[in-house]
Amino acid sequence: MAEIAVEVVYALPERQALLRLSVPAGTSAREAVRLSGIAEVFPELDIHCCPLGIFGKALANPEERPLEAGERVEIYRPLIADPKEVRKQRAARARAERGD
């Protein structure tokens, strides 16, 4: 079976990793993460259930999505803050600064 080149990336605020690897054609996004060995670089990462995406687009079923040559699998971290709540806080600060 032919091999394809893909990348697996993960980033924390203080540390990032980009791993390039060759995988058999038809390998799923989740399997590529496992094959990359990124769990050894970030032992706290649970690669079996973390959300994945490709080039900034989240995957609904990373276990079923076969990769294409050159794709970058991104491992997503949970959000630290609720985006809606952050917007509310920012708006409240802006109102307070304007004196509304």
Swiss-Prot record:
Top-level division of the source organism's lineage: Bacteria
Gene3D superfamilies in the record: RnfH-like
Pfam families registered for this protein in UniProt: Ub-RnfH (PF03658)
InterPro entries noted in UniProt: Mopterin_synth/thiamin_S_b, RnfH, RnfH_sf
Family: Belongs to the UPF0125 (RnfH) family.
Identification of the protein by name: Protein RnfH
Species this protein is from: Pseudomonas paraeruginosa (strain DSM 24068 / PA7)
Taxonomic classification: Bacteria, Pseudomonadati, Pseudomonadota, Gammaproteobacteria, Pseudomonadales
Gene for this chain: rnfH
